[in-house]
């Protein structure tokens, strides 16, 4: 019932989004730092549930990240919950190339995208869909959550394909005011009547003609 009530809410009042669970996708090449990558995966997984996915073209990096996850889990305060989250929603994927890693990351349209490659800016140009992007080894998601400045309310579940993070714009309401002179309307008339006829809305067309035929 809670989910139904939440979905019905926008009928009466707009909300920012229905966000969660938390997500991270990490794109790394052979230069990626396994300790940093593991730390960021755990930082998302400890939300429990939270998904954490590594896409790397380097099998060696993948192996070292798996080892780092185990050693870090052993001393993590929420270790059991985090391990359960990783087992259910985590993955280490070895891709065939850096291009494939970027393509998969873009398809996932994740909430948080971390790029730990030799040239993160070059990787970034292949990405169109992500809630927030963290470039290079010294840009952990936690910095974005708490101090670096971007919104902490970000699109999840693939909605970064069409949505952005919460901003001040969510609290603003815009409108449109149109005033045309007769010559302006005449210049638009052909387009208006074509579209109106296509939709079968003849009264729309005639509302324009009434002003121009007299």
Residue ranges and their predicted role:
Residues 14-88, 92:
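A conserved active-site cap/scaffold subdomain adjacent to cofactor or substrate pockets
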Residues 1, 57, 61, 163:
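Short acidic-hydrophobic sequence patches enriched in Asp/Glu that either
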Residues 98, 106-214:
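C-terminal core of ALDH-fold dehydrogenases
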Residues 2-9:
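Short, small-residue-biased leader/transition segments that mark boundaries at the very start
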Residues 73-114, 118-119:
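Glycine-rich, Lys/Arg-enriched anion-binding loops that position phosphate/diphosphate groups
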